[in-house]
Curated annotation (Swiss-Prot):
The modification Phosphoserine is found at residues 19, 28-29, 529. This is Large neutral amino acids transporter small subunit 2. GO terms for biological process: L-alanine import across plasma membrane; L-leucine import across plasma membrane; neutral amino acid transport; proline transmembrane transport; thyroid hormone transport; tryptophan transport; valine transport. The record marks 134, 246 as: Important for substrate specificity. Optimum pH is 6.5. Residues 1-44, 96-116, 179-181, 253-265, 339-364, 409-423, 467-535 are cytoplasmic. The gene is SLC7A8.
Length: 535
């Protein structure tokens, strides 16, 4: 571990650029060095997007939109419109993904465009709450649908649910640590499984329509309100619809592991988002052919109720489909979130050991173990659902900040290479819709949003003490270096090399925070470079 294995914490050089790609450029599969391998093709890329968007919600409780829309027709319109807005946001992320081709997604874009503090706050809220709680909830949903048939007359024991959820997390963490190819194969298989289950639901809906069972789809009935119309509730329906499409940006977290990202990133987005929109709209239409709006709203597991009504002895397919869907969802979330933490550590925003990969498997084992451990900790707390409510607003806030960064980058750096360059009307449309939902969220739940902001702002002192403050006591640096070395030996990991060439070229010598955002002018650098440096 002599070459590039150890990190020098006590340095005199103070960087001030938007990124560190000169020290840590895109990982490559070429050469013989240790580097992240480009093993994610177009099919696997689509599997990551579709698998992360489609979790258990469309099977279990797609009723949030209908409940707030007030009519079947308006609910279908909400699903279509939110799908279109999601596609617009994905187009914006596609341009950013090929303009700043780094893993880390919106964290990397916000950091490079607006500076280190903004990027750190995005990372902080993701590390602290968003990913651990979401993964814990998905794993608990998986265990609930696996154990429920064993307890037909009562609820499964809570300890059993949490134990099976922990086993699920540990198993998938092992798969992800072992091989990127294994992880993507698991994602492909389980994404295909959930799409087949949804295709069955849609086909059954078509059969119902052919039988004349479309009372609630007739125009006069579709827009028959079962509650008083309210603009606030309609806005809430759009907010629920937007949350249902969450995960559309996850492929941007693994850009460096994509085969030919300049082509496959936008292609995967263009294929996946319309596919998910189609599935969401027609699955909800299918549900309405078998259930009245009141029955749908009263059901705790819509797909299971649908199966009981139409599939007869084959109704067991639906709970199994939910379990398979959530299992794949946990895998996709582990895969992408670990790359976010890897990217954060590479920029000096998290402990440096998280930026290392296994010397043979080329997987970010420390980042995966960190992700798994934080999720296991969430499994033993009873407040994770409350935390999700608090930070959901913050997560949505950063979507808009990232898209706004696209406009800022167009203005400040108009000449940098952009393999994809969309019309600025698209980010403007997305930001208008985003602002509408954001303002409504603040108006309807000011306390929840305020607590979410407070949780995010706890990252400010952490940033200045842990990242911005460079000249820490030598005893502290020595202790951290010792922990890093021990972790390296336990996990058999090193920093990735530049091109798999000489070890000296890939050595990660400095991981200090960079203060100057990408959009700040720097006349000494070439206009096509995204990095800014200050001696």
């Amino acid at each position: 571990m002599e070459k590039g294995a150890r990190h020098r914490h006590n340095t005199d050089k103070n960087h001030a650029g938007g990124s560190e790609s000169e020290d840590f450029p895109e990982a490559s599969s070429g050469g013989g060095g240790v580097a992240l391998k480009k093993e994610i093709g177009l099919v696997s890329a689509c599997g990551i997007i579709v698998g992360n968007i489609i979790g258990s919600g469309i099977f279990v409780s797609p009723k949030g939109v209908l409940e707030n829309a007030g009519s079947v027709g308006l609910a279908v319109i909400v699903w279509i419109v939110t799908g279109l807005i999601t596609a617009v946001g994905a187009l914006c992320y596609a341009e950013l993904g090929v303009t700043i081709p780094k893993s880390g997604g919106d964290y990397s874009y916000v950091k490079d465009i607006f500076g280190g503090l903004a990027g750190f706050l995005r990372l902080w809220i993701a590390v602290l709450v968003i990913y651990p709680t979401n993964q814990a909830v998905i794993a608990l949903t998986f265990s609930n649908y696996v154990l429920q048939p064993l307890f037909p007359t009562c609820f499964p024991p809570d300890s059993g649910l949490r134990l099976l959820a922990a086993i699920c997390l540990l198993l998938l963490t092992w798969v992800n640590c072992s091989s990127v190819r294994w992880a993507t194969r698991v994602q492909d298989i389980f994404t295909a499984g959930k799409l087949l289950a949804l295709a069955l639901i849609i086909i059954m809906g078509v059969v119902q329509i052919c039988k004349g069972e479309y009372f609630w789809l007739e125009p006069k009935n579709a827009f028959d309100n079962f509650q008083e119309p309210d603009i606030g509730l309609i806005a809430l329906a759009f907010l629920q619809g937007s949350f249902a499409y969450g995960g559309w940006n996850f492929l941007n977290y693994v850009t460096e592991e994509l085969v030919d990202p300049y082509k496959n990133l936008p292609r995967a987005i263009f294929i996946s988002i319309p596919l998910v929109t189609f599935v969401y709209v027609f699955a909800n239409v299918a549900y309405i052919t078998a259930m009245s709006p009141q029955e749908l709203l009263a059901s705790n597991a819509v797909a299971v109720t649908f199966g009981e009504k139409l599939l007869g002895v084959m109704a067991w397919i639906m709970p199994i489909s939910v379990a398979l869907s959530t299992f794949g969802g946990v895998n996709g979330s582990l895969f992408t979130s670990s790359r976010l933490f890897f990217a954060g550590a590479r920029e000096g925003h998290l402990p440096s050991v998280l930026a290392m990969i296994h010397v043979k498997r080329c997987t970010p084992i420390p980042a995966l173990l960190f992700t798994c451990l934080s999720t296991l900790l969430m499994l033993v707390t009873s407040d994770m659902y409350t935390l999700i409510n608090y930070v959901g607003f913050i997560n949505y806030l950063f979507y808009g900040v990232t898209v706004a960064g696209q406009i800022v980058l167009r203005w400040k750096k108009p000449d940098i290479p952009r393999p994809i360059k969309i019309n600025l009307l698209f980010p403007i449309i997305y930001l208008l819709f985003w602002a509408f939902l954001l303002i409504f969220s603040l108006w309807s739940e000011p306390v929840v949003c305020g607590i979410g902001l407070a949780i995010m702002l706890t990252g400010v002192p952490v940033y200045f003490l842990g990242v911005y403050w460079q000249h820490k006591p030598k005893c502290f640096n020595d202790f951290i270096e010792l922990l890093t070395l021990v972790s390296q030996k336990m996990c058999v990991v090193v920093y990735p090399e530049v091109d798999g060439g000489s070890g000296t070229e890939g050595t990660r010598e400095d991981m200090e925070e960079q203060q100057q955002p990408i959009c700040q002018p720097s006349p000494g650098k070439d206009k096509d470079s995204l990095e800014q440096s200050q001696p």
